[in-house]
A protein has these predicted regions:
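C-terminal non-catalytic interaction/assembly regions of soluble proteins
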Residues: 82-180
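Accessory alpha-helical/coil subdomains and C-terminal extensions
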Residues: 1-82, 87-89, 171-180
Length: 180
């Protein structure tokens, strides 16, 4: 769910998932049957604060990306459309990824578009960069879910990129549905 209203009681709405229920006359009316948890709920109190969201806008300066790679372990790039790297940033992304990949830096591609999610496979530049660096892609996860999950996983898996990537794609309470 994503917070869509600032002051209303019905502030949250489902994104890329059907509405589960509503409250009417003090009762919960479920649209989908209740599904019990597969495992007990766990709480993670130790998280990494070294995650940064970088929202691309037209004219974004490449040196910002260099600064973020220097100062954060994980950068979530919120890109345009299905999620790709603009030509103006491509050289910087390659340079920074080559420079930092051995030190366990994580780059995640997301989209600024709320519905349907990202798909880096649509355009050649997205295909290439995803393949070259085994980038993690957010697909249909909300930005809030992406950031929260990464904060937990960075603390758990640290520099083990493969383990972190595998855990990222493991579905938690329907947070990711369309990972390819």
């Amino acid at each position: 769910a994503k917070k869509m209203q600032a002051r209303s009681f019905n502030a949250f709405q489902s994104v890329n998932f059907p509405v589960l229920a509503r409250v009417q006359d003090g009762r919960i009316i479920r649209y989908l049957p209740y599904i019990p948890e597969r495992e007990p709920v766990r709480f993670f109190t130790e998280i990494s604060d070294s995650v940064c969201v970088f929202k691309l806008i037209p004219g974004t300066r490449p040196e910002l990306l260099s600064y973020l790679f220097e100062n954060y372990d994980c950068i979530v790039i919120e890109s345009f459309g299905v999620g790709g790297i603009p030509d103006a940033l491509l050289d910087t992304v390659y340079r920074e990824m080559n420079k930092w990949k051995e030190s366990g830096k994580v780059l995640v591609m997301a989209t600024q578009v709320m519905n349907e999610g990202s798909n880096m496979e649509i355009y050649r530049v997205g295909q290439k960069i995803k393949k070259d660096f085994q980038l993690i892609e957010a697909y249909d996860m909300t930005l809030e879910a992406v950031v929260t999950k990464l904060m937990v996983l960075l603390k758990q898996y640290g520099k083990s990129y493969e383990a972190l990537q595998k855990a990222f794609y493991r579905e938690v309470n329907h947070d990711i549905l369309c990972a390819v």
